[in-house]
Amino acid sequence: MPAETWRLLDTGVSDPYTNMAIDEAILLEHREGKTPPTLRFYAWSPPTISLGYFQQLEKEIDLEAVKERGLGLVRRLTGGRAVLHDDEVTYSVVAREDHPLMIGGIRPSYLRLAKALAAGLRELGAPVEIASGRKGGREEHTTAACFDAPSWYEITCGGRKLVGSAQTRKGGVVLQHGSIVLTLNGDDLFAVLKMPSEAVRQRLLAKFYHQACGLEEVLGRRVEAGVIKENIVRAFTRLYAVEFVPGGLTEGEKGRLKELRAKYAAADWLKRR
């Protein structure tokens, strides 16, 4: 069977508004049939808190603490909870809902993408597993943080979450993006989450470090981001017969960026909930 051609993008380091604008621009141009399915890698400057689409900003985030720590703040197009993007490799995948990797709904598509991500990480020596889903029961206090518990088909190591992802579907196109954590920074994340008391904050921060991890801790060594990306690309190729062609943003995508970046930078978008 001939390999399917995908575009491989590495857009490097950008500010939070640009990063989210690029993901949406890729989605919109793919919806119009102007671009192939795309795997993108990127990074963030400054380190940034990204909110899930449905989160309530003023209820969950201490804006003064965000400012004091010099963090960026942006609301994602995807759902889920707050993520601190710091020392990580961020990926996104855009393809149509009827693509073989995406058919069947959210959970099956999560699983297919997780298999490729996990295979790439295993090539590095990480003994990762794919979580089957959330455990039952209620916590004493549910935080707004994404990495405090694994969700459906997310990647764990020894039961601790290593990769967190979120997905949205718009106009027949799927956007999934996620964070492959290199070193965990719970201190900054929990400093900006609103808590009922400092005692609760410290208790949940300790729990967070018990339930999440970074790749450097798992491997006992530092792996360069480029090596991680190469392994993930090879895993997609091996599992799903995808041929990746390195490329850049199209003129159509670039043409959308100014307006989309302004949307993500606007207070109305950030405070929409």
Swiss-Prot record:
The active site is at C146 (acyl-thioester intermediate). It is an enzyme of class 2 (transferase). GO terms for molecular function: lipoyl(octanoyl) transferase activity. It holds the Pfam family LplA-B_cat. Its EC number is 2.3.1.181. SUPFAM superfamilies: Class II aaRS and biotin synthetases. Residues 33-244 form the BPL/LPL catalytic domain. PROSITE patterns: BPL_LPL_CATALYTIC (PS51733). Monomer. In the reaction, the free carboxyl group of octanoic acid is attached via an amide linkage to the epsilon-amino group of a specific lysine residue of lipoyl domains of lipoate-dependent enzymes. The reaction proceeds via an octanoyl-thioester enzyme intermediate. This is Octanoyltransferase LipM. It comes from Moorella thermoacetica (strain ATCC 39073 / JCM 9320).
